[in-house]
UniProtKB/Swiss-Prot annotation:
Assigned protein family: Belongs to the pyrokinin family.
Protein name as annotated: Cardio acceleratory peptide 2b
Organism, as annotated: Drosophila melanogaster
UniProt GO molecular function: diuretic hormone activity; myostimulatory hormone activity; neuropeptide hormone activity; neuropeptide receptor binding
Taxonomic placement: Eukaryota, Metazoa, Ecdysozoa, Arthropoda, Hexapoda
Pfam annotation, one family: Periviscerokin
GO cellular component terms, A-Z: extracellular region; extracellular space
General function of this protein: CAP-1 and CAP-2, but not CAP-3 are ligands for the Capa receptor. CAP-1 and CAP-2 are probably components of the signal transduction pathway that leads to Malpighian tubule fluid secretion via the second messenger nitric oxide. CAP-3 is a ligand for the PK1-R G-protein coupled receptor.
Tissue distribution of the protein: In larvae, the precursor peptide is exclusively present in a single pair of neuroendocrine cells in the labial neuromere (subesophageal ganglion) and three pairs of cells in the ventral ganglion abdominal neuromeres.
Length: 151
């Protein structure tokens, strides 16, 4: 029985020693199979999604620089040569200049609106407590009897 147990332990040890399984534990856990790629993003975001007046003004400046560009204006062969290591993202929501102007006007309106402007509060009240006090009327009368008025 002991020799059988020794043989089994010896076989398991030999299999573990000479197995060709991968034993590299220092491997980078963020490999390609994790879905995370380190690369710069290519393309520009939609300026019509500006959420403040400053972003709206920047979008207007960019509109003057880029103008109304369409997909036909770009030569794909040039981009494939220059950006071989870059991953291209679609330009989501690329609207025309009119939509960017509407976004700018909406940002102006929000600045002028008291509820959403720069002085808008969070709606929380930090003043004194209003409403029913924790002191009832009887104990309040007892406390006021002991006080003396100063003239």
């Amino acid at each position: 029985m002991k020799s059988m147990l020794v043989h089994i332990v010896l076989v398991i040890f030999i299999i573990a020693e000479f197995s060709t399984a991968e034993t590299d534990h220092d491997k980078n856990r963020r490999g390609a199979n994790m879905g995370l790629y380190a690369f710069p993003r290519v393309g520009r975001s939609d300026p019509s999604l500006a959420n403040s007046l400053r972003d709206g003004l920047e979008a207007g400046v960019l509109d003057g620089i880029y103008g109304d560009a369409s997909q036909e204006d770009y030569n794909e062969a040039d981009f494939q040569k220059k950006a071989s290591g870059l991953v291209a993202f679609p330009r989501v929501g690329r609207g025309d200049a009119e939509l960017r102007k509407w976004a700018h006007l909406l940002a102006l309106q929000q600045v002028l609106d008291k509820r959403t402007g720069p002085s808008a509060s969070s709606g929380l009240w930090f003043g004194p407590r209003l409403g029913k006090r924790s002191v009832d009327a009887k104990s309040f009368a007892d406390i006021s009897k002991g006080q003396k008025e100063l003239n």
